[in-house]
Amino acid sequence: YLLAEHYGIDYEKKGISVRGHIYWAEYEENVEDDYALLSFDTESAWSSCDLFFEEVNKALGDELSISWREVEPGFDIFYTHDENDFFPEECYVTAYGELFEDCEGAYSTFGDAIKLWCEKTGVSQDGRSEQKMIDFINEYEYEAEDTNFCINPITFG
């Protein structure tokens, strides 16, 4: 909410959620190419802060190009709005359990996620198409109940 107050955005009146916080930020500038990039990660509740970003952009004279990725596995939200190819990944893996420690995250291709799963489990793709393999992995039943690996497509828009 501090950023909203700084730019004079009446988020309550406009019904814009500002729940959450910015937990990482970085600024890069290339004067030669007339290019500046402000990157940050936010932790918000259930959905992206895109309406808020649009209001900040208006306050700055519509000078920004805004790209973002929204991930909320508990609600099956895997969405990217990308004006500059900052988020080219095709899928997001949700994973837990000892077998899949450090596997959760975005992957460049479905094939990369499938390959990782095959390496971790020792199960071969065995001629299955990419989509058949994704279905196979997402429906796979593990011996340990606290283990799962799911390949989720990222929707672009």
Task: Annotate the PLM regions.
Residues Y1-G157:
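Intrinsic low-complexity, intrinsically disordered or marginally ordered coil/linker segments
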